[in-house]
């Protein structure tokens, strides 16, 4: 990536923290917009500019930017049933304003879509999944109607450095199990534990985002490993007692990334295996 002026929405969140860190190392000038509904000042990195701003305030965007990474949305699946107004505000109203401004200024956008759109039962799985799918479709439409340049990236169950900074119980199961083991309490498994996930290290997510920003193709890319593990297998890797709790609304059974297109088109190569990572903790 050549030196660019880049806006990262949600830059004080877990993924934003890691992305900005990498973008700065590559010599880019980076500004973050975050309303700190989930992000934290603990994620601020020296060298980046941080502005407390909702994406509905997209009128502040100007044509000095070369690229926008749009990560700043409501990101909780299960709570979205009770917080549907917030999810709509962040993920539909805010995103529309930002996308429309990017179209007006001819600034390309890399969007952090949700892999829930690609799973059964898809976009109707939860308010969160529906709104994220709506935004992805809107970006596709803006590409067709107005020539907006974009890529959409779908994340699969992110773990690794920085992701433990998600300040609520709706964290990655990896972080939950790690904390439960440290506190010497049983690992809690929702449902029967046979649900399978593609667990992706945050460094691999960042690799994919950088590649997507360098290769704007008006395309969609799944960022995962192409390998799935059941929650029971993840728990076994922690080698700690477990207990089962009732399933939650919005939980899905399976989620496996199909990364062939991403690898062939962008040169994406996942590097971290989740079981190896757990055993190194």
Task: Locate the predicted segments by residue.
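N-terminal Rossmann-like NAD(P)+-binding domain of SDR-like oxidoreductases, especially those catalyzing
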Residues: 1-158
